[in-house]
Amino acid sequence: MAKKVIGFIKLQIPAGGANPAPPVGPALGQKGVNIMEFCKQFNAKTQADAGTIIPVVITVYSDKSFTFITKTPPAPVLLLKEANQKKGSGEPNRNKVGTVTGEQVRKIAELKMPDLNAVDLAGAEAMIRGTARSMGIVVQD
């Protein structure tokens, strides 16, 4: 018989940087999950991407065991990394903070494709271009 799922927890945690402090500890503690065990497993799985924000979906079962799935980093994080910027523009239509090439957008779209709700690569690229536009990053073709 399969274990009964009692909840899902969605978090965005720096790769290799999970620790029992907020937001990880309180979110897992509410469901009764072994916080240190999760931190060890997550840090071991993501240590190669250290520092990058990684979304994670944790499935908690009735016996307090858990499984987790890591996703690709959010598109804004990848765009800022490609544009060598710390943050996006506060006024994206007026102030542009950086530029990325069409090739860099394609690379990000290929990386994000499993997590995006896009039919093909062209649709994924359009989503990434829209994200860049809303952050004040210019896409050069």
Curated annotation (Swiss-Prot):
UniProt cross-references to PANTHER family, sorted A to Z: 60S RIBOSOMAL PROTEIN L12, LARGE RIBOSOMAL SUBUNIT PROTEIN UL11M
Family named by the database record: Belongs to the universal ribosomal protein uL11 family.
Database matches in InterPro entries: Ribosomal_uL11, Ribosomal_uL11_bac-typ, Ribosomal_uL11_C, Ribosomal_uL11_C_sf, Ribosomal_uL11_N, Ribosomal_uL11_N_sf
SUPFAM superfamilies documented for this protein: Ribosomal L11/L12e N-terminal domain (SSF54747), Ribosomal protein L11, C-terminal domain (SSF46906)
Quaternary data: Part of the ribosomal stalk of the 50S ribosomal subunit. Interacts with L10 and the large rRNA to form the base of the stalk. L10 forms an elongated spine to which L12 dimers bind in a sequential fashion forming a multimeric L10(L12)X complex.
Biological processes per GO annotation: translation
SMART domains listed in its UniProt record: RL11
Organism listed in the record: Chlorobium chlorochromatii (strain CaD3)
Protein name in UniProt: Large ribosomal subunit protein uL11
